[in-house]
Amino acid sequence: MVEGIPKRWKVLSGQNKWKGLLDPLDPDLRRYIIHYGEMSQVGYDAFNWDRKSRYAGDCYYSKNRLLARTGFLKANPFRYKVTKYIYATASIKLPISFIVKSLSKDASRVQTNWMGYIAVATDQGKAMLGRRDIVVAWRGTLQPYEWANDFDFPLEPAISVFPVTDPKDNPRIGSGWLDIYTASDSRSPYDTTSAQEQVQGELKRLLELYKDEEISITFTGHSLGAVMSVLSAADLVYGKKNNININLQKKQVPITVFAFGSPRIGDHNFKNVVDSLQPLNILRIVNVPDVAPHYPLLLYSEIGEVLEINTLNSTYLKRSLNFRNYHNLEIYLHGMAGMQDTDGVFKLEIGRDISLVNKGLDALKDEYLVPSTWRCLANKGMLQMDDGTWKLDVHRRDHDDDVDADDNDDSSTSNQLQELNTD
């Protein structure tokens, strides 16, 4: 069901702002959006959320093994190679769900978290996608209702990212969003530069490397990751850093954002800046019962085009008063696979495994016989020592200098939940 994507990728990436594709939802666009949502889901599946681990806030896997270990490659025609990890820090106090801090005194990262990755389509992926696609996938947060209550989201001038000539037009962005994107820590061995600098530096390298090919840059993320996707994409286009020179002529690389469950980011001036940027196309996917896209409530403006889904219509899901469920990315992707049009009908149009819904939730109806929160490391990361005792010491077992590692070899996915040794 991907035959049309290589020929239609420009339209699917928003060249015409998705006019005529959203209601009813175009079949190719449905698969296309799910693909980028799954690339964002990799960030959740690879992230160490356990604050009892001294490696909390890190990624379990190396770049070479990330896509295979998270199961992304199985039966997936879209192939990518991960080229860089993104790390972020914070200089202000943020909710724990933003920057996860280990409770261990021996923690490897006190203020630094793994925030996502950059990947480029392989030759095989290029054939299936119609061009050399560069993806910036940002990791999100699991507990939006915690930060909605605990974080007051003051607006802050974003002149450092979007300088304007008239102070009255100065865009303002939520201070938490801006801090995660622009803060740096010179003491960190992982992100002495800011997430902003890391992303722009790697994209500059990749654009130069593939400048003689047809290229696109696609940003994707969920929740906090959706915010970072919009912010980093707008920053790139605003600074004209998506321009490449070919034979003394400038060429603009198209930029697309697929933002799942994104909170609001900035004020009306920020919206005006984003709306003026070309070629920048933003599609926000919003689940009707999810409250996160409506926060913060005051002084913030919504941006981009909107595709609404409603997972309350799914016949596979339990009815729940737990609003956290409706924000979950796997719930979003389930909704994308089955949504029809505005008449409220729900029918799975793509054979996306419904068991993925229960990966981190208890949301599927019991009749489907899928255990709740089934995805976890073997023994929850507890490793047995030589003396017979057990210790929580989960970290990456595969290293980036492992020349035999191949992220396009999906044979290793059967071992993706094995213990992660530290050596």
UniProtKB/Swiss-Prot annotation:
Compositionally biased intervals (Acidic residues): 401-410
Q: Where is this region: Disordered?
A: 399-423
One protein family per Pfam: Lipase_3
Q: Where found in the cell?
A: Cytoplasm
CDD domains noted in UniProt:
Lipase_3 (cd00519)
Q: Does the keyword Chloroplast apply?
A: no
Query: Which InterPro entries does this one have?
Result: AB_hydrolase_fold, Fungal_lipase-type, PLA
**GO biological process: one example:** lipid catabolic process
Q: Name one GO cellular component term.
A: cytoplasm
Enzyme Commission code(s) on record: 3.1.1.-
Q: Which domain of life is it from?
A: Eukaryota
Coiled-coil annotated residue ranges, if any: 194-217
Q: Which UniProt keywords apply?
A: Coiled coil, Cytoplasm, Hydrolase, Lipid degradation, Lipid metabolism
Cite the active-site annotation: 223, 290, 327
From the UniProt record, which GO molecular function terms apply?
phospholipase A1 activity
Query: Locations of Polar residues compositional bias?
Result: 411-423
Q: Which family does it belong to?
A: Belongs to the AB hydrolase superfamily. Lipase family.
Q: What does this protein do?
A: Acylhydrolase that catalyzes the hydrolysis of phospholipids at the sn-1 position.
Q: What is this protein called?
A: Phospholipase A1-IIalpha
Tell me which species this is from: Arabidopsis thaliana (Mouse-ear cress)
